[in-house]
A protein has these predicted regions:
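Flexible "arm" and connector segments at domain edges
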Residues: 1-60, 64-123
Length: 123
């Protein structure tokens, strides 16, 4: 069972809707999902400021959890989307097969980069 599937099981067990078709949920659900993600991002920021690695691990895991929950609330298969984005990200290598970075360390797009096509999962 993937992490995404595990969160779906949690949501079903606790009476939360798990959509099987992509769609925008009602405003209350959208607001809840955004608030949950925002809260966990704030916890990560606080943990980083405190240099508390255990709290950082907790916040990062919670960010994944609530993001997977949002995927289910919107009926988006995040496992499939992740695989598509992963393949796209791996296409960012330079023509010499090496990564290209900007001055902040961000990986840049190489000549063989292709944009992920998430539309095929939103049907």
């Amino acid at each position: 069972m993937t992490n995404f599937e595990s969160v779906g099981k949690f949501m079903e067990t606790f009476g939360q809707e798990v959509k099987t078709k992509p769609e925008i949920p009602d405003a209350k659900t959208v607001e809840l999902r955004i608030e949950l993600i925002s809260e966990e991002l704030e916890e990560l920021w606080d943990a980083c400021k405190d240099k508390d690695i255990v709290s950082i691990a907790d916040a990062l895991t919670d960010i994944l959890y609530v993001t997977y929950g949002a995927g289910h609330a919107f009926g988006i298969d995040l496992d499939a989307c992740f695989e598509e984005v992963q393949n796209s990200n791996m296409s960012k290598l330079g023509s010499d097969g090496k990564p290209i970075f900007n001055d902040k360390g961000k990986v840049l797009k190489g000549p063989n980069y292709f944009k992920p096509d998430l539309s095929k999962y939103i049907k």
